[in-house]
Amino acid sequence: MVLVTYPAPDFTASAISCNGDIINNFNFKEFTNNQTSILFFWPMDFTFVCPSEIIAFNQELSKFKKRNVKLIGVSIDSVYVHHAWRNTLSHNGQIDKINFTMVSDLKREIQRSYGIEHPQLGVALRATFLIDKNRIIRHQTINDLPFGRNISETLRMIDALHFYEKYGEVCPANWKKGDTGIKTTQEGIHKYLEKISKK
């Protein structure tokens, strides 16, 4: 299901905070509070690709904070399993601690509302949603279970969104932070094509 351009479905569920506290009624809308956010799903704790993704997101967390972006993760595990997994990752020396909120989707209602439930296994596919300050989904990626996602690409898309919001210029192929955009006029596209033809 493609949700880009649509409002992000709201939800209230149990969660583990970045401090490891259990939140019984975590509300997505209240937590994001008109900030850009990344909502990402993984299948289950204590599996194989999932730890690599959680660690990768956690290692880059300062880059999300620098961009004023809230990071929220979701799986079908209970808050108690989330808590145990956090401790296991930490005790194994892989990370100090997980510093973002982990939501429990025990009833699978959240993953279904985002249309990313695996049709046979009932777990979430590896989905990532970039949601703007008006709670509109601007970008989404969905990977099958064997394939971990690229955190650098997630950050690049955040930069692209913020660039567009600030300057009103669109971002061409392979755009990255520091590059110029394209003004949405005939003159703008002409200048861009002229520029790349000289490379």
Swiss-Prot record:
Sorted alphabetically, the keyword list is: Antioxidant, Cytoplasm, Disulfide bond, Oxidoreductase, Peroxidase, Redox-active center
Q: Where are the catalytic residues?
A: 50
So what EC number does this one have?
1.11.1.26
All copies of the Thioredoxin domain together span 2-163
Q: Name one GO biological process term.
A: cell redox homeostasis
**What's its job?**
Thiol-specific peroxidase that catalyzes the reduction of hydrogen peroxide and organic hydroperoxides to water and alcohols, respectively. Plays a role in cell protection against oxidative stress by detoxifying peroxides.
Q: Which family does it belong to?
A: Belongs to the peroxiredoxin family. AhpC/Prx1 subfamily.
Q: Additional comments on file?
A: The active site is a conserved redox-active cysteine residue, the peroxidatic cysteine (C(P)), which makes the nucleophilic attack on the peroxide substrate. The peroxide oxidizes the C(P)-SH to cysteine sulfenic acid (C(P)-SOH), which then reacts with another cysteine residue, the resolving cysteine (C(R)), to form a disulfide bridge. The disulfide is subsequently reduced by an appropriate electron donor to complete the catalytic cycle. In this typical 2-Cys peroxiredoxin, C(R) is provided by the other dimeric subunit to form an intersubunit disulfide.
Quaternary structure per UniProt? Homodimer; disulfide-linked, upon oxidation. 5 homodimers assemble to form a ring-like decamer.
This one is known as Alkyl hydroperoxide reductase C
